[in-house]
């Protein structure tokens, strides 16, 4: 039956070919003769590899390989220079060979849902035209920072994986509009997410998040889903304070940072000559109240932002707990309205 369809397609110089659900164990090599083909559908078969003859499909823009038996992304796709949409959902893929990503300069959409992936190759950055990447329902434990170099990415779907953190480089995805991270193991979000000025939809439901980054309320979200997280609640209680004792490292760091902040030429010159010290100090934080720069020791507080009127939220969420860092109890004791210490149970 498949051979008959292919023969008719060759005679008619077809631009599309539907071989879905034919129980194919291999792709007939005659498909390579369909040089006018722009869309090839091979869903719901028994395929585990592609023939090299497919490389002749120089005009192919859409390739459907969902619900087959592929264990890795087939390297043959690198020859499909015009490919824009690639569907590989519902396979057994646990590997993406770096070579498979060569030549896919025009790929806009990649669907890898429902596979067995634990990681992505660093070469993912080669997909510079990619706008939508979906890797829901895999076993992803981390995402490489190189993924954040995809400047045209608009949608990133990573729901139902095993992610416990996100790279700081997430802030590089300046065109991102939709980020789906539900049902992972995230305990927080990087501060860099607040730089995603086009982000409209954020889904972090079903994680372990207690509070959001300090500038989260400034992200232009229209939809926020965060149900089934242990979010901090506004329940003030009396607590005794124990004045902090700074380590020698912290005292020294604050002294140096203070001089650097005041543009002291001696300290600026010295820090330029000591790259290790410069690297350590680059991870500084800033007190939300007094503006003091500090390194490793701080008081983690929270403020609550009313987001109900600003965006669509899940579970009737009205007050969003937003992380605030203070340099000392001295600042905390200024009794700034709306800033609360985080209770440790």
Swiss-Prot record:
Name the domain of life this protein comes from: Eukaryota
The family database entries (PROSITE patterns) matched by this protein are listed as:
LRR
Segments annotated as LRR repeats: 13-34, 36-58, 59-80, 82-103, 106-127, 129-151, 152-173, 175-196, 198-219, 220-241
Under SUPFAM superfamilies, the record lists: L domain-like
Q: Which residues cross the membrane?
A: none
Disulfide-bond pairs as recorded: none
Under InterPro entries, the record lists: Leu-rich_rpt, Leu-rich_rpt_typical-subtyp, LRR-SigEffector_domain, LRR_dom_sf, LRR_R13L4/SHOC2-like
List UniProt keywords, sorted A-Z. Answer: Leucine-rich repeat, Repeat
Q: Name one Pfam family in it.
A: LRR_14
UniProt family annotation = Belongs to the LRRC69 family.
Q: What's this protein's name? A: Leucine-rich repeat-containing protein 69
- Upper lineage: Eukaryota, Metazoa, Chordata, Craniata, Vertebrata
């Amino acid at each position: 039956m498949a051979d008959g369809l292919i023969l008719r397609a060759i005679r008619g110089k077809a631009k599309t070919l539907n071989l879905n659900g034919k129980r194919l164990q291999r792709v007939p090599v005659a498909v390579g003769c369909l040089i006018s083909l722009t869309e090839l559908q091979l869903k719901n078969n028994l395929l585990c590899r592609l023939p090299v003859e497919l490389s002749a499909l120089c005009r192919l823009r859409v390739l459907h390989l969902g619900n087959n038996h592929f264990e890795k992304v087939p390297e043959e796709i690198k020859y499909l220079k015009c490919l824009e949409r690639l569907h590989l959902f519902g396979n057994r893929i646990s590997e993406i060979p770096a070579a498979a990503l060569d030549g896919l300069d025009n790929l806009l959409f990649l669907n890898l849902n429902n596979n067995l992936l634990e990681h992505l190759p660093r070469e993912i950055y080669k997909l510079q035209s990619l706008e939508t990447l979906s890797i829901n329902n895999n076993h992803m434990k981390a995402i490489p920072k190189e993924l954040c170099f995809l400047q045209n990415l608009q949608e990133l779907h990573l729901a139902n994986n095993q992610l416990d953190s996100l790279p700081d480089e997430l802030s590089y995805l300046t065109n991102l509009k939709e980020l789906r991270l539900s049902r992972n193991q995230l305990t927080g979000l990087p501060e860099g997410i607040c730089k995603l000025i086009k982000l409209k939809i954020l889904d972090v439901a079903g994680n372990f998040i207690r509070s959001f980054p300090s500038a989260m309320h400034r992200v232009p979200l229209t939809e926020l889903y965060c149900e089934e997280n242990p979010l901090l609640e506004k329940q003030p209680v009396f607590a005794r304070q124990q004045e902090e004792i700074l380590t020698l490292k912290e005292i020294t760091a604050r002294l140096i940072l203070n001089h650097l902040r005041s543009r002291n030429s001696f300290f600026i010159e010295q820090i330029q000559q000591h790259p290790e010290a410069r690297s350590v100090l680059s991870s500084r934080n800033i007190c939300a109240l007094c503006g003091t720069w500090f390194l490793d020791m701080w008081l983690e507080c929270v403020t609550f932002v009313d987001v109900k009127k600003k965006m669509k939220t899940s579970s009737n969420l009205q007050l969003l707990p937003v992380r605030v860092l203070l340099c000392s109890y001295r600042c905390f004791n200024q009794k700034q309205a709306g800033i609360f210490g985080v209770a440790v149970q």
